[in-house]
Amino acid sequence: MIIACGIAVSAYPQQALYPSSFPLGDVQLLDSRFSKAQALNVDVLLKYDVDRLLAPYLKEAGLTPKAESFPCWDGLDGHVGGHYLTALAIHYASTGDPRLKERMDYMISELKRCQDASGNGYVGGVPDGKPLWDGLKSGNIELVWKYWVPWYNVHKTYAGLRDAWLYAGDTQAKDMFLKFCDWGLDIIAPLSDEQMEAMLDQEFGGMPEVFADAYAITVDRKYLDGARRFSHHWLLDSMAAGVDNLDNKHANTQVPKVVGYERIAEVADDSLYRDASVFFWETVSGTRSLSIGGNSRREHFAPKDDCKSYVTDREGPESCNTNNMLKLSEGLFRMSRDARYADFYERALYNHILSTQHPVHGGYVYFTPARPAHYRVYSQPNSGMWCCVGTGMENHGKYGEFIYSHFGDSLYVNLFIPSRLDWKEKGVTVTQTGDFPADDSVSFTVDVKKPARFTLMLRHPGWCDNMQVTVNGKPVSVTSAPQSYLAIDRKWKKGDRVDLKLPMKVSVEEVPNVPDYISVVYGPVVLAARYSTEGLDGLVADDSRWAHIAHGPLVSVFDTPVLIGSREEIVDALKSMEPVEGKPLHFRVPRLLKGKYASMELEPFADIHDARYMLYWLSMTQDRYDNYLKMEKAAEAMSLDLDRRTIDVVKPGEQQPEADHFMANEQSKTGYLNDVAWRDASDGGFFSYRMKPAGEKGALLLVKYWGNEPEGRQVEIYIEGELIASENLSGKWGIDEFVTESYALPEWVTANDAVTVTFQSVERGNTGGIYDVRIVKP
């Protein structure tokens, strides 16, 4: 069914655009971890300097900024401002706090000044954006690569304006949003389908989603056409055909695309887009996600035969990805009412999203390392303008969005979060109470003005074998299976009470394709353990370029607790874990954690902060572990030594490391060999990075090459324009493996805090692939 209906004026734009959702203001969070997180996030949002967030927009509109722009992540100026506008709207809708509305109104008025000054509907903060947009309109697609993901950037402003109307009812923001959409359509109108596809090779956020929403608002076909034009067929067509082509792809480039595909499927009843969305969700949630619901490492989907990198890399699942996977899950649920989407939503919400907010100062998390005994770092207000700060601003105001849904006379309970629902259309109030998941009981009390008939649909979670339900103390005769909904159809009276019992059991989940690493799960809760509080370098991040990464020393897996035994023995030992008195969801496992680890407690991962932790555990029989120790310990020691010596490192061909190092390039391309990314340059082209010797005397430059390059592969390496090495790679080693070469850095180089390292090709030649570039201590 096509749901687009042409929305003119509505008291509840959220419900008009998403008919099965309740307005955030109609779902009140009651006392719980979620309500506390929401309240804390309001305090954090109010600490941000709005004029500094607005400065990039004013500058690009030719107006005088009222404050300086934030310096962190310069080049992506304006993206966090869009997220912040969304966050204000969401939290205002959820709490009614007038301070949030005051800020939202101010932002909209300032953005309106910017849009009016532009004269063409544009309102964005992309630095020096006019030459870009003019060039794109004239067909110069290559220009996007000279900017930092500009469509991704402006998408945040599109979403912010839409959300100010969607959640907070601001009609001026809606008008601005549609004018901005018209500007976007004007930019892409002259472009051929081939040019669009080439442009969409770069990250562009959720552009198809916002145009699909513009269509849902207006029923003007031009916006739906725009949404389809922003559909990257490289991904859309493969997903619709059931082909997984996600290995080594930047994860949060792909997920927002599919959020858009789902939205197009929803508003246009398009089966191709629906099939693509479902297959993508099944692929990512089923084979490319960790137990907490997060995905990716170093921002990329791991290749299926290298998933061990999930537990070896310091850069684990990115928070933005999970934010968008929740949007996708919610959308697919709206189309299908399939409980599996709600099960995934619950897992990701309880274990990843909750964990990305510090419970005291409210800082946001970028990466959640799954490597044993590593840790997370946190943002602070007015510093670190990361993408995950932007989505972090939004996350904690939306906890009420998916607790309940309604379809006709059916009320779906999707999440077990203490809350009070005001179902105005039915004159029904439902109050949900309990201390789930610390306690396995949940209660619902119905309050109606007069008896009302509706069907209460209670989610039977996939992790619960035997859900028990009573109405007014009497067991219901209806049965249900795990990962489904139990229906109670009756005429409800004031004071009717429904009680659920949700027995939880312990289980283990493996890293995808890596059975030797397991995570412990209890019901929907991932249990982890605190390892230590030592070496938490950069725990609260500053404005430095890479402060979102936990740069403290890595711990050898051989210095962490290992779960010894067969899988059956380990699961059996976990089944006998002992609750810790006075500490809900804390357990000791004396049959597994012994000796110096005997005092370790398993507890909800989302509750562990300011500490190194064990989220995944190496798990083997004693014989296998003894053999593994002999084979891998030396290699692990070498890897950790290189990590310890590394001052700065770039992974060529990977988006964020290159952006973080201010890459410049001409005649350059990227690819993968043996699942390792590379970059090269040809025919006099080059690529360069800003790198930091940090004053380290005797520092070395290490460059990784492929050991069997064909003819015509020659690279010249320059630092600050001075040639330091020239390599003819053709036939140099003649081996099919990677080779790392070391180059001594002159003292004048190491005395600098930062230098430009350039890889230059010769005329009619090619540099060969460069796979890793790092500056290390001697």
Question: Where are the language model's segments positioned?
Answer:
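Bacterial N-terminal signal peptides
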Residues: 1-8
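Aromatic (Trp/Tyr) and acidic
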Residues: 14-98, 102, 133-167, 204-222, ...
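Asp-box/WD-like beta-propeller blade repeats and closely related beta-sheet repeat scaffolds
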Residues: 129-148, 174-198
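Solenoidal tandem-repeat scaffolds enriched in leucines and small polar residues
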Residues: 181, 188, 194, 198-233, ...
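C-terminal beta-rich recognition modules with glycine/proline-rich loops and embedded aromatic residues
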Residues: 277, 342-351, 356-445, 481, ...
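Aromatic-lined ligand-binding clefts that engage carbohydrates, nucleic acids, or primary amines
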Residues: 455-461, 703-709
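Solvent-exposed beta-hairpin/edge-strand motifs
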Residues: 459-471, 716-719
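Beta-strand-rich ligand-recognition modules
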Residues: 475-495, 501-515, 668-698, 704-778
